[in-house]
């Protein structure tokens, strides 16, 4: 029977392994909700499911494009439709899982039209002052420290001469998905930090530096994919910014830097998920088992 649900969580929360175990039990297919797994040749840095796992469970959203290719939310939505059509044709469930919550939010909320970029001539305080006067709905929901949204708001304001919140209501497309159950794997902060540090060690021991070296010699170092956590730090390592690349100190500095940046990312993901998916069901990872999840939440 076809049905779909999402399994989200921060990086290193165990989403991939748990979703694969679930998929085995309910004979589901998986749509990867990860902005790095979609790239070919980025396997270790993305913590991508291994070849054996990919052979056992049908995955979508993985190995779609090369690292120097453009990929946007619209492309991801097309991949979602492919995954859904396949699941319906096989009469099986679809599990949507990963850490790129922006993709999921875009499918649930709809997409706004793409606007041309303009030069931002005002500082953030000046833009915020305008927003406070004409668009209190915006300022009540967001912070003036959220530069991305603030600049997008100003961009809409300048290009349309309308109040941005009103313009978005009129011009945002209908949601791609409605009434989706969302489950979040939740870890204690200190436990998650330890998981991140352990995963970083595993990635380095599995050949992260060699993978990164091939990527940096194949593609321009300024492409988006090579600025991802795990790869950008390797770029600094190759440039001897972390010490002599032949020294153990440089490796330890690399490991520490990746862990720090990953912990910071996890904090941002947790904050994003709590704001974007208020109806999500939070799962206690300490007692979480596949059978328990199936019994309690899917009634299987």
Swiss-Prot record:
Entry annotated with the keyword Nucleotide-binding: yes
Annotated binding of ATP, by residue: 9-16
Region (Interaction with substrate tRNA): 34-37
Site keyed Interaction with substrate tRNA: positions: 100
Binding positions for substrate per the UniProt entry: 11-16
Alphabetical UniProt keywords: ATP-binding, Magnesium, Nucleotide-binding, Transferase, tRNA processing
Transmembrane segments: none
MF terms (GO), sorted A to Z: ATP binding; tRNA dimethylallyltransferase activity
GO biological process, one term: tRNA modification
Gene3D superfamilies noted in UniProt: Crystal structure of tRNA isopentenylpyrophosphate transferase (bh2366) domain (1.10.287.890), P-loop containing nucleotide triphosphate hydrolases (3.40.50.300)
EC number, as in UniProt: 2.5.1.75
Catalysis performed (reactions): adenosine(37) in tRNA + dimethylallyl diphosphate = N(6)-dimethylallyladenosine(37) in tRNA + diphosphate
Cofactor or coenzyme needed: Mg(2+)
Keyword Iron-sulfur annotated: no
Protein family membership: Belongs to the IPP transferase family.
Quaternary assembly: Monomer.
Function: Catalyzes the transfer of a dimethylallyl group onto the adenine at position 37 in tRNAs that read codons beginning with uridine, leading to the formation of N6-(dimethylallyl)adenosine (i(6)A).
NCBIfam families the UniProt entry points to: miaA
Name used for this protein in its record: tRNA dimethylallyltransferase
Name of the coding gene: miaA
